[in-house]
Amino acid sequence: MKVHVKAFATFREVMDNQVDMEFTEGATLRTLLAGLTGRYGGLNELMFATPDTLRDFVNILKNGRNVHFLSGLDTQLENGDVIALFPPIAGG
């Protein structure tokens, strides 16, 4: 299956703006992130507080829905999904 990934803000500085990735059936968001952090070394430090915990305020959307309200890192991926990666953003 093919999944389209879009990166925003500081995530774009360490990876391509958009990338298509292919997975076998049963892949999860955790699988996708492992592939991305393996390909783009600096992404792991920006995204994860611990190996199994995203940094606070990192937002990941699957087809426009925050994965926090789905199954988190265990959210199942499906063919054609669009995953958007947003780092913490602060303003003042």
Language-model segments: residues:
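Ubiquitin-like/PB1-type beta-grasp interaction modules and other compact soluble beta-rich domains
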Residues: M1-G91
